Each structure stands twice: as C-alpha cells, then as structure tokens.
Swiss-Prot record:
Pathway: Protein modification; lipoprotein biosynthesis (diacylglyceryl transfer). The gene is lgt. One of its GO terms (molecular function) is phosphatidylglycerol-prolipoprotein diacylglyceryl transferase activity. Changing I76V: In strain: HP439. This is Phosphatidylglycerol--prolipoprotein diacylglyceryl transferase. Changing I264V: In strain: HP500. The keyword Oxidoreductase does not apply. GO terms for cellular component: plasma membrane. It comes from Helicobacter pylori (strain ATCC 700392 / 26695) (Campylobacter pylori). Catalyzes the transfer of the diacylglyceryl group from phosphatidylglycerol to the sulfhydryl group of the N-terminal cysteine of a prolipoprotein, the first step in the formation of mature lipoproteins. The chain crosses the membrane at residues 14-34, 62-82, 106-126, 136-156, 190-210, 218-238, 252-272.
Length: 284
C-alpha cells in the first residue's frame, strides 16, 4: 500500500466554506472547465479565422446558449436516465435545480449526465443557429476542439469529489495495485482520471489531427463524437456502474449503451455535413 492508494484519507473534497456554504473542489474544477473551453475556442477563432469565421461577440452569445443547453440537458438527462426517484422530480420540476436540501442547507446541484448534456448542447446550438444554419457546423466544430481539455477538469473534479469511483482492482493486477485508490476499504481503479486521459486528452489529440487533415465543416464534431464514444466505451470497463443501474445485455453499462447511440448521432451529423459541404461547393 502506497501514499497514492490512500490519498482519499488525506484529502477533503470541500475546498473552503463561505459561512454555511461549502465550496467543493468539483465546483472549482467545473469553473475551470468552462473557462478553459471558452478561451480555447477564442484562440481557435483568432488562430484559424478561415475555418472559424466567427466574431468574438457572436461566439460569446453562442457560448452562453451552449452552456445553458449543457447544464439543462445534463441535469434533466440525469433525472430521466439515472435518478431512481425520477417520478418525484417530474411532478416537482422546480426541485431539479434546487441547490438546497429540505433543511435549507446549501448542498449544490448534484447528478449530471454527460450524454444528457450533449443532447442539450445540440438542441441549444440548433436553436441559436436556426436563422443561419450554415454556421451550425462551424459552431459545433469550435466546441469539438475546445471541449476536451475542459472535460479533463470536469473528470478531475469528479476525482476530487470522490464520486464516480472505479471498479474493484483484481488482486492479480500489478498495475491496478499501484494506481488503485482505496474507497470504502476496497482498492478501486481511479476511473475518473482514466476518463480524463482517454476522453479528454486523447480525444483532443484526435480532433487536432482531424483539424490538420480535413477542411469540411462538421468533421471535427464527428471525430469528437466518434472518438469520445470509443474512449468512453473503453473507460467504462474501469468505472463502477451506477448502483441503481447495474449492467444490461452483454454486461454493458448504461454509459456504454449511450455511447453506442452517440455513434449513431455522430454518423447522422456526418451525413448532414457531407450534404452541406456539397451544397457549398455547388454554390461556389
């Protein structure tokens, strides 16, 4: 047993308190994720204006729509997919975003679904771009290249918050014994950090490669969608399935099943992008 294995015993998920309000590291990590994604997108606009012909003010307005869509979609998606008491929230809709418990204590908003956030993001992007759909793919590509590094902070936040823990490390796994984290007297994979690397860093490199080798609008979001789906599918083998969900056919987790649906959505965007690029060439 090394110091890393027992890091949770030495770490408090609460960063600091403001009176009765406890600020968790996860909240700070999420803020870093938003800032990172925002400024990464601005950098891309400045560095490659031909691929991303968008004014800063225009992007700032769009970013607010996208972030709102992500938050709404992520929270509602969690309620519909993962929350065992979803019926209560559907009849008490205002409680979905209530950051206080029954005693009036601030506890924050817990329970977000990445795939729900993705749906919310796509809906918000479409609504914002509906008057000029030619820019829709440009916006999606811009987020595809700026989101992965922000995502890294989000998963680090999950790790610091000691949530979304990994599966139990087999006793014959030498690497697992080294990198595992003790959670409730069980050595588990640090699945949050595995996801940060696979779904954040690796996917970012995939999208950057696609940016260098493609010119068609919409292909970056397709590469992101397919790349994330693959990396999430792999990472789920190290992540403990939600206790209220378990596994389904072929022992697949809900995250893996939703990732398969994400592949279908990505292929749909690919078809749309292909048709859209043909129209642009014809008009030119």
């Amino acid at each position: 047993m090394n110091a890393w294995n027992t890091i949770y015993d030495q770490f408090n998920p609460i960063a600091f308190s403001l009176g009765s309000i406890e600020v968790h590291w996860y909240g700070l990590a999420y803020a870093c994720a938003i800032v990172t994604a925002f400024y990464m997108a601005l950098r891309m606009i400045q560095k490659d204006p031909k691929r991303f012909p968008i004014e800063r003010k225009e992007f700032e307005s769009y970013f607010l729509w996208a972030e709102l869509g992500i938050v709404l979609g992520a929270r509602i998606g969690y309620i519909l997919i993962y929350e065992p008491n979803s019926g209560y929230y559907l009849t008490h809709f205002w409680q979905i975003f209530n950051p206080f418990d029954s005693h009036g204590n601030f506890v924050g908003i817990r329970g977000m679904s990445y795939h729900g956030g993705l749906v919310g993001f796509l809906i918000a992007s479409y609504l914002y771009s509906r008057k000029d759909l030619k820019k829709l793919l440009i916006y999606l590509d811009l987020i595809a290249i700026s989101l992965p590094l922000g995502y890294v902070f989000g998963r680090i936040g999950n790790f610091l918050n000691q949530e979304l823990v990994g599966r139990i490390v087999p006793k014959d796994s030498h690497l697992g014994q080294i990198i595992g984290i003790m959670v409730d007297n069980e050595l588990r994979y640090p699945s949050q950090l595995i996801e940060a690397f696979l779904e954040g860093v690796i996917v970012f490199l995939m999208v950057m490669w696609a940016k260098k080798h493609t010119k068609t609008h919409g292909l970056l979001i397709v590469v992101y969608g397919l790349g994330y789906s693959l990396m999430r599918f792999i990472a789920e083998f190290y992540r403990e399935p939600d206790s209220q969900m378990g596994v389904y056919f072929l022992n697949l987790s809900m995250g893996q099943i939703l990732s398969l649906f994400m592949v279908i959505v990505s292929l749909g965007i690919l078809l749309y992008a292909t048709k859209n690029s043909k129209k642009i060439k014809e008009n030119q």
